[in-house]
Amino acid sequence: MAKLLALSLSFCFLLLGGCFALREQPQQNECQLERLDALEPDNRIESEGGLIETWNPNNKQFRCAGVALSRATLQRNALRRPYYSNAPQEIFIQQGNGYFGMVFPGCPETFEEPQESEQGEGRRYRDRHQKVNRFREGDIIAVPTGIVFWMYNDQDTPVIAVSLTDIRSSNNQLDQMPRRFYLAGNHEQEFLQYQHQQGGKQEQENEGNNIFSGFKRDYLEDAFNVNRHIVDRLQGRNEDEEKGAIVKVKGGLSIISPPEKQARHQRGSRQEEDEDEEKQPRHQRGSRQEEEEDEDEERQPRHQRRRGEEEEEDKKERGGSQKGKSRRQGDNGLEETVCTAKLRLNIGPSSSPDIYNPEAGRIKTVTSLDLPVLRWLKLSAEHGSLHKNAMFVPHYNLNANSIIYALKGRARLQVVNCNGNTVFDGELEAGRALTVPQNYAVAAKSLSDRFSYVAFKTNDRAGIARLAGTSSVINNLPLDVVAATFNLQRNEARQLKSNNPFKFLVPARESENRASA
């Protein structure tokens, strides 16, 4: 038995450790994009407990980035049935609270019921399973390749989860098409129609079967040591297709979870956001310029002052991995293992921002330095919000493609390619997605009272270079180099370097505020 456990763990490490390899490169000319579009989902699959919407992964800009995008909505007491994918995923919780779980091969069942909780056929049965986690609005959840994942909404507010699948990951040994392997049901695969558009062949006569459907009944009877009736349910025989990938659970699920976490999450993220806004004035000291210049010094005290049992939990679970320090005295010094890896981190409005200007907005990022599991996935993310007429200065992603999904409001974005051509100059509004290829320059200005977005990035340590403002590329060039490069007088070059005192986020001009009032 010990050998089997060791073998399973070795397989799991091989499965996840391979992510250190580079992503596969796009085919020639795939990223020579002369035009970008803000895209809406173009496929919708209804289920008993919600719906799944998908964007076409064959679209040129998604093919350039090597990703697929989908959005799931779960109503109260809705369960997204367990499935696994051929590529790693980042899931952002746009709205709602609930539970999620993953199954890692070889890891122990660390959650169990008390002995008196259930009885059957004269003997006590105690349910045991791997860890179940809570999620809340603003969370990023990392799902490795081939790992079974499920989620459940136990609240009245619908859960909206936006998922990016990195189909160009080196861990995807199939074709460049996202695939979901469901453990139950007989519903339609959400990306199946795009596979047909690409010229793929039908893999089965019935394209809605689950992973058990193709096995003979007697194989499954022997494998599970159960009767044929249970096997028929396992294979989804005679099940209504309308149930779909998201099913309603009558009476709700009974989930083993620490009671203090349940109470904390039942308060919901809205209360946390209200508390966050009440504390905001504490940090609005000094001029707007000082706010940005002192962001590094203020970040740690602000983080410590945040109420946030969730923030404290995140900090404890993340431990010293960000700074290479041990989580606590007496720690054995080992790297966090697959079985105990932290799988989520909150980057939403209730989290402590990395970049903050009270008159312009805020930005929060998560990389593998914050959430080490992202090192396996080779992905990271960014959440930001802009006040009306505030601008995110022109910048570019050093080492990643960026898929920007608008959460709320609308903004005008401009994107420029290597030839100096504008490939996008338009509005990005809530529910739409825009791909910004690596090194393409982009700037954004909010057209709403508050524009918020999440950006998925195809590198676990994605970085940006700013083209304007303090500490930007232009600002860090010698004055004479700037003057000679742009054919400017020295005083003009000095203005170009120093007139914008802000690093990232530029507040609206007073004239713009008056015009919008």
Swiss-Prot record:
Keywords recorded for this protein, A-Z: Disulfide bond, Seed storage protein, Signal, Storage protein
Keyword Signal: yes
Disulfide-bond pairs as recorded: 31-64, 107-339
GO molecular function annotation: nutrient reservoir activity
Domain Cupin type-1 span(s) in chain numbering: 36-232, 345-494
InterPro entries to which the protein is assigned, alphabetical: 11S_seedstore_CS, 11S_seedstore_pln, Cupin_1, RmlC-like_jellyroll, RmlC_Cupin_sf, Seed_Storage-Functional
Source taxon at top rank: Eukaryota
Region (Disordered): 249-335
Signal peptide boundaries: 1-21
Oligomeric form and interacting partners: Hexamer; each subunit is composed of an acidic and a basic chain derived from a single precursor and linked by a disulfide bond.
Homology family: Belongs to the 11S seed storage protein (globulins) family.
Function text: This protein found in the seeds of many leguminous and non-leguminous plants is the source of sulfur-containing amino acids in seed meals.
Name listed for the protein in its UniProt record: Legumin A
Gene behind the chain: LEGA
